[in-house]
A protein has these predicted regions:
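N-terminal Rossmann-like NAD(P) cofactor-binding subdomain of oxidoreductases
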Residues: 1-86, 91-93, 111, 184-187, ...
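Low-complexity, flexible helical/coil segments
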Residues: 10-15, 19-20, 69-71, 95-102, ...
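Short glycine- and Lys/Arg-enriched binding-loop motifs that mark or flank ligand-binding interfaces
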Residues: 33, 63-66, 124, 200-202, ...
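A generic structural signal for alpha-helix starts
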Residues: 38, 139-140, 200
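Alpha-helical scaffold segments in soluble metabolic enzymes
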Residues: 42-46, 101-105, 144, 208, ...
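C-terminal substrate-binding/catalytic lobe of Rossmann-fold NAD(P)-dependent oxidoreductases
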Residues: 56-64, 68-194
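NAD(P)-dependent Rossmann-like dehydrogenase/reductase catalytic/cofactor-binding core
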Residues: 178-226
């Protein structure tokens, strides 16, 4: 159960790069997205809005890898770095708590229900999220995807679009508010493979909150985040 359902009903859910108008800036309460959903929605929502992707239920497969800081600061042997070093493990499959958030926002973007297969993993790094998305998209080209991204993110300081065949690296976004994305097409399978990385503690959490505050106050969105 939500601890404050009355407040939840008033909140505006905001990834600033995905907002289509400025109405949210006058809101009293902003709900900042989760870390995994941010790494997933930034590359996919513009494509769903454009109608490029129409995945069948369960055919949109998302594998994400998070650093141990994603578990918070609770004292748990499983999350000690000495326990995780040299080891990767899946967790929360099926039914991770972020699935509802992801599917809700994808449904809004696509104008119809979208069912995802989300597979989170715990990786041996302090911070960062690496996401790989596999989606059937026969006939959709890399150029079409890149054109949608370029239109959606023109002038946005925290989105880096890499050339097809270049793959984002968590080390390149660590300690920043940036998200980096790329796409390749697999002609053999008819799938698009989209990759993205963020810092789970900044773009995936506190940094995005500061970015939202900056925009609400009419300040430069990168204030305090450069």
């Amino acid at each position: 159960d939500h601890p404050a359902p009355a407040l939840a009903a008033q909140a505006h859910y905001v990834i600033p790069e995905l907002q289509t108008d400025d109405a949210w800036k006058s809101a009293k309460l902003i709900a900042c997205p989760g870390c995994y959903p941010t790494s997933i929605q930034v590359p996919l929502v513009p494509l769903l809005r454009a109608g490029l992707l129409k995945p069948e239920p369960g055919r949109l497969i998302i594998n994400s890898y998070s650093g141990v800081s994603g578990a918070g600061k609770k004292a748990d042997v499983a999350f000690l770095f000495c326990e995780r070093d040299g080891s990767i493990k899946a967790y929360g499959i099926p039914g991770h708590r972020h699935i509802a958030e992801i599917e809700e926002q994808f449904g809004v973007a696509a104008g119809q229900p979208v069912v995802v297969q989300f597979n989170p993993h715990l990786a041996p790094m302090h911070r960062g999220i690496a996401t790989t998305i596999v989606v059937p998209a026969p006939g959709v080209t890399v150029a079409q995807v890149e054109a949608v991204w370029q239109k959606a993110y023109a002038g946005r300081p925290f989105v880096t679009l890499l050339k097809s065949g270049e793959f984002p690296d968590t080390a390149h976004v660590a300690n920043t508010n940036r998200v980096s994305c790329s796409v390749v097409a697999d002609a053999r399978t008819g799938n698009l493979i989209i990759t993205s990385v963020i810092d789970n503690l900044l773009k995936g959490a506190g940094g995005q909150a500061v970015q939202n505050l900056n925009l609400m106050m009419g300040w430069d969105e990168s204030e305090g985040l450069r």
